[in-house]
Amino acid sequence: MGKRFVSLHAICIALLFMAVSCDQTFDPLQKNEDLTFSMYGVVDVHGQFSVVRVMPIGERLINTDPESNNSQVFLIHNSTGDQIAFQDSLYKFGGDTYVWNYFSSEDLSANSSYRFVAQNSEGRSSVAQINLPSELPIPTIEEYSTGFESGIFIGQSVDPIVSVKTRYFVQPVNEIGCDPEMEIVISHLDQLITYADGRYRLEVNNRSEISAALGPSVENFVINRRELLIVSSGEDWPDLSELIDLEITLPDVINNVEGGVGYVAGVAGRIIQITTPQEPC
């Protein structure tokens, strides 16, 4: 299995994004013999955000061992039995802290139920039941100004929109050339206007936020990519509105994993290129 470093944003775009603390330790008095894996992430109808963090449950949820544990991770369609293998991806937080993310770019059947399964070399497994939402139509870019980084997006969704963000790949420019590319992500869920018939509308004005993210020392910059990231979900999406932060971090509070801990949600996601991408300078 290959080691591939991927952006954590693909996981964080949805779900509590690693609701359980990365350094959370299980209670040594708690019986964990029946718990095999912790699993957090999303499975996407359109295959653009299907990434799930899968870690063997040991003393801690994450470890310092970059070697593969020979886990097999796959998705099974409950009606047809069709199976899709997820590929592994080693993610390094920094120092010697490693986690395993598993991803797939396969399109899936909307409004269908699946089982997300992680199995270790001894045959023990953890399973999450997932209900996928309807397909998410691609929204329309009604207008966009690259000068002000402002625009209007409109669309329609059968299921509630649970995440909407703009993402920019930006390079500061100095007198001798360009600095390394930076990723800037701005959430707009609070700005989203939704209607009873499923239509939605989003207006953004991001120039000042991009400048603030770059810092006062950056006077000039180029934007190589501008993207709209939008995600919908149905009954699978957890309701955290009545939970306090401490409750969210407890493994048994938000959990749909049998034989393990965690939460894997079904979503429909789209990544829309707002303007034509260009190569870094």
Enumerate the language-model features and the residues they cover.
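Processing junctions and N-termini across compartments
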Residues: 13-16, 275
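Bacterial N-terminal signal peptides that target proteins for export
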Residues: 1-11
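A sequence/structural signal for flexible, mid-protein segments enriched
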Residues: 23-281
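C-terminal motif of bacterial Sec signal peptides marking the signal peptidase cleavage site
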Residues: 18-21
